[in-house]
Amino acid sequence: MSLVSTAPYTYTPLNLLKEGTIANVYGVVKFFKPPYVSKGTDYCSVVTIVDQTNVKLTCMLFSGNYEALPIIYKVGDIVRFHRLKIQVYKNELQGINCSGFASLTFEGTVGMPVTARTSSKVFSFTPQDQKMVEALRVWASKHISASSTLVQLCDAQPMQYYDLTCQLLGKAQVDSTAFLLKVWDGTQTVLPSWRVSTQDLTFEGDLSHIERLQSLVVDILVYDNHVQVARSIEVGCFLRLYSLHTKLQPGNSETSSSESLRLEFHLHGGTSYGRGIRVLPDTSPCVDQLKKALEGANLPVTETSTGICQSENGDSSALSNSGSGAVSPYEEERCQQVSATILTNHQHLEKTPLCAILTQKAPQQYRVRAKLRSYLPRRLSQSVKLLCPKCHSVQEVPHGDSLDKILQDAATEAPDIKLKATSLYYSKVWTTEDQGGRQVAVHFVKNNGILPASSECLILIEGGRLCEVSKLSSKFHSVMPVRSGPESLELLTLSAPFLIQGKVHHYGCKQCSSLKPIQNLNSRFHKGPWTPSSVAEALGVVPLQYVFVMVFTLDDGTGVLEAYLKDSEHFFKIPASEVLTDDDLQRSLETIMDMICPPGIKVDAYPWLECLLKSYNVTIGTERRICYQIFDTTVAENVV
């Protein structure tokens, strides 16, 4: 690399960037994702930068060459981008690379040499650039928290996420979506580390050297999109792994609990939280520090009687390369953090295997991680039911002809002319030309004695058929089927909707409702628009809720369990009340189910679901059984 003299560049502060321009910028790295393979053939890197204006800019950078993307090692590094195109994405400015894009990266620590990292053979760097880097360093030292996730193995604790700088000693392909890295950083973990069996694997590296280092070596499993990068790394290289997950794995149950605990290391699939791998050059300052640590490492003097090789082949906690389709521990770890569902509460609960849940009494709450083996009903429209929140009864939603018959059978008597035109409503009655001269009355509810606009008007209809009710509901705010009572209008029947708004029909519970006369709607005046809850309250109706009632068959490899899904509007983020009449929502629901329970492939390839389950007792006749229900769980945003 060499410097070239050129006319000074103009750099734009981040708060002055404009959509549609091409700019040169400096910034401090606030967040980044190391280069990863995008959905196409290019590599992608995401970088969020900030400058003295305290404005952030996220940049999406693509290149067919891994090395052409910014060489960023940690949060706090300083970058210079030339020819960055500014566009708007989701109402925020975003930077993307365009023709001629170039980048430099600098260590962000005050006092360190100002040395540029770049794959370019020539680049410009002036005294003014030097001043800008040093000014950003000083500003960042006061305003940006230094990255605290970089740790040594000796400081690693379970159930955390870390960045690790290390040297690669050996590697092996476990299967198409899992790859083993054996690494060290010169320090030893507090707990013994988990060992992956290499007996049936094609291993690259010096096993005798690894055996001499013994407990200074840890096994790391990387998954999915990281496998391609891991496969290309040469043994002996220095690495930084980002967002490495540590957790405890119980070992041999025959030993004491403290002796059997082992520390696992996993680099999960995906790029969330900046997860990834970066090869560090030998000239990097952090590699210099690592080399000193490796040279000064306290190597074990003697081997234990078991030795690493024996442990790798015989340790009960070791991972075997099973070719079966059963769910295995590493199969689950591979997909952690990319679950198709997320928890909205109770994240503190520890995960419980299904085999343990099936042996315990109810009621209990559990956190599980499993795959959706199957579900019922297969016709998703049949899953929409009506649930009473008070008595918990469930009933079918009346459809088409059945609803029309309910309206027809309930409206057998002609409207009572004495109940026309009260202070509450204005009435209009007409007689149909066919159908035996059926009389239909429409009562327009007033607001403070005045008829409101149709978009705000509630109308009461007597003697109407489904086609007439549907036509009126498309033109007026709300429609209520009623009949003439002895002294005033009454709700038609709770077999029919008590309120219709657009295409949505609102029903009430026959068992729990205590109906009041229509005149009670007077209590709703001056209280805003007509809502199902306010109308139900005024008329003594306990409204039924639209829910998806489904049965999920869950499988985590230890057991199979059937669980009800009732809190499904929260789960799917789709209103159950609208899915029956909205083709787009039906397609969305089908898409979600196809993603969490894909047709035409083996269960092994299904995504994992992280769910909360609650168990409860149910008595049916003389039989007492335990049922399970999914709660406080929702489909992840990338699935919806």
Swiss-Prot record:
It comes from the Eukaryota. GO terms for biological process: chromosome organization; positive regulation of telomere maintenance; telomere capping; telomere maintenance via telomerase. One of its GO terms (molecular function) is single-stranded telomeric DNA binding. Keywords: Chromosome, DNA-binding, Nucleus, Telomere. It is found in: Nucleus; Chromosome, Telomere. The keyword rRNA-binding does not apply. GO terms for cellular component: chromosome, telomeric region; nuclear telomere cap complex; nucleoplasm; shelterin complex. Component of the telomerase ribonucleoprotein (RNP) complex that is essential for the replication of chromosome termini. Is a component of the double-stranded telomeric DNA-binding TRF1 complex which is involved in the regulation of telomere length by cis-inhibition of telomerase. Also acts as a single-stranded telomeric DNA-binding protein and thus may act as a downstream effector of the TRF1 complex and may transduce information about telomere maintenance and/or length to the telomere terminus. Belongs to the telombin family. Homodimer or homooligomer. Component of the shelterin complex (telosome) composed of TERF1, TERF2, TINF2, TERF2IP, ACD and POT1. Binds single-stranded telomeric DNA as a monomer. Associated component of the telomerase holoenzyme complex. Found in a complex with TERF1, TINF2 and TNKS1. Interacts with TNKS1. Forms heterodimers with ACD. Identified in a complex with ACD and single-stranded telomeric DNA. This is Protection of telomeres protein 1.
